[in-house]
A protein has these predicted regions:
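Membrane-interface junctions at transmembrane-helix termini in multi-pass inner-membrane proteins
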Residues: 82, 135-157, 207, 338-369, ...
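Hydrophobic alpha-helical transmembrane segments
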Residues: 127, 156-204, 368-373, 387-409, ...
Length: 483
């Protein structure tokens, strides 16, 4: 049997092998992080765990401001647009990222007392944060180029080594440190510095370009208007934890952070599918063959819905495994955030058209509306209904976010292509079915018998549709072609 599997694997097309390994790699990376969660929730108090997650939330915000998220958006698009000159393009953007990080580091050092007070962080934490902005950019530039070229072996090795080292080093530092929050954060920074620095020199050596006026201008003109979009995305995903810490307490922020982290397990499906589909979708748009996209997109949405329903169904057991009883309330926060993951994937499908046609102003408008609504709802409802309501405000905002991007996508497609890529009725059917089943499982949390009866019914339906589900998985693997 093993020989048969090995032979089948050897005869798979390169694009299928690459897609398979990208998915396995994403799973493994996230799995290690998840496996480490119950260790950190037990060697750190709920308050310390909350403080670390607030610190990490600040990192995601600072990353946007400092690096402009150059390794996303413009970079993926640029690898396709400048396919004849990828190495110089990659090296030039690495150089631009260095300049941006150094500039902001000097700005911080010149007024560090002011910035420390603004973020309520120490100098050590701030410098580690700036270092991680650079190291994460280095890795994402290198990894993006590997994915587009379907060169998966080196990417898998680097990703897995760093993924294993992060929790190992983190546990060792936290156990022996008095300041466990800073120790946990420094562990991440140290591993990334050692693991990713060499990748910077690899791309610089291959591209032999630090400064390119054309590439730098293209990247800045594309991504600066997107900064509000990226910041708004971070506000949608991180502001709730910061607001809970400030409006309630860090212990509540820790409980909410656990629910958010567990719900975000399924974001790896979003990432894996998006990384697999993005070059293919961009190529279809370029070839004006958008009719080919719909079937694959519907199947992808069904797959994302299924995996998130699995998380919602078993949330009580998952929370009890990953944290002590002090975190029990996190169970009730998991479902709305897991449902949000579905809408994150949906809006990404719609936004591909906005990115391709460089309609960054529309992307910015949708993102800012979602972020402002999220902050306003949290500010209004958390004092009234408690911090748990932040999960539902997140869901409401992502639903609105996806709807606005859908409307903008249709507007662009009518103008540029003269046709619409998706059928509104099919999208609505998939979405409403997903929400209905998700809330049924949530209602079953009051009764173990009822919940497992629902799980049994769902399992029977899933088994009867197993051929369809396998067809979806195979189709996701086969859409990739070398670009």
């Amino acid at each position: 049997m093993l020989v048969s599997i090995r032979n089948k694997y050897r005869h798979l097309p390169k694009q299928v092998k690459a897609s398979l390994w990208f998915l396995v790699c994403a799973f493994f990376e996230k799995s290690i992080s998840i496996i480490a969660t119950p260790i950190f929730t037990r060697i750190m108090s709920a308050s310390e765990y909350g403080q670390f997650n607030v610190l990490y939330s600040w990192l995601t915000i600072v990353t946007i401001i400092v690096s402009l998220n150059l390794c996303y958006g413009v970079y993926t698009q640029g690898l396709i647009k400048f396919s004849h000159d990828r190495r110089r393009y990659s090296a030039a953007l690495q150089g631009l990222a260095v300049v941006l990080v150094l500039t902001w580091t000097l700005i911080y050092l010149g007024f560090r007392d002011f910035w420390n007070n603004v973020f309520s962080l120490t100098t050590t934490q701030m410098l580690a944060m700036l270092l991680m902005v650079w190291t994460s950019s280095v890795f994402n530039f290198w990894a993006g180029e590997r994915r587009v070229a379907l060169q998966y072996k080196s990417l898998v090795v680097v990703t897995l080594l760093v993924a294993i080292a992060k929790p190992v080093v983190g546990v060792l530092l936290v156990v022996y440190a008095n300041d466990k929050v800073t120790a946990r954060f420094l562990g991440l920074a140290l591993v990334e510095l050692v693991g990713y620095t060499g990748l910077f020199f690899v791309q610089m050596y291959r591209g032999k370009t630090f400064f390119s006026r054309y590439f730098w201008r293209h990247a800045l003109m594309f991504n600066i208007p997107l900064a509000p979009h990226y910041l708004s995305q971070i506000v949608l995903s991180s502001a709730d934890r910061i607001m809970i810490a400030n409006m309630v307490n860090t212990k509540s922020a820790g409980i909410y952070s656990l629910a958010y982290s567990l719900s975000q397990i399924m974001i790896l499906f979003n990432v894996a599918l998006s990384q697999t589909l993005s070059p293919w979708i961009y190529q279809k748009i370029k070839d004006r063959r958008v009719a080919d996209i719909a079937g694959v997109a519907y199947d992808a949405l069904v797959l994302i819905a299924v995996v998130n329903l699995l998380l919602i169904a078993f949330a009580p057991e998952i929370v009890s495994i990953f944290a002590p009883r002090a975190y029990a309330k996190a169970t009730w926060i998991v479902p709305p955030i897991a449902m949000s993951v579905f809408f994150i994937f949906a809006f990404d499908l719609f936004a591909k058209f906005e990115f391709y046609y460089e309609r960054t102003s529309l992307i910015m408008i949708a993102s800012v509306i979602g972020a402002v609504l999220n902050v306003a709802l949290n500010y209004w409802l958390i004092p009234i209904l408690g911090y748990e309501v932040a999960g539902y405000t997140t869901l409401i905002c992502y639903v609105m976010y996806a709807v606005v991007h859908y409307w903008f996508m249709n507007r662009i497609c009518r103008e540029k292509l003269g046709t619409l890529p998706y059928d509104r009725k099919i999208l609505g059917l998939i979405t409403l079915t997903f929400l209905a089943v998700g809330f049924l499982f949530l209602g079953g949390y009051h009764s173990v018998v009822l919940r497992y009866l629902l799980i049994l019914i769902t399992a029977v339906v899933g088994f009867s549709k197993r051929d369809y589900l396998m067809t979806i998985v195979n189709q996701m693997l086969r859409v990739r072609k070398p670009i």
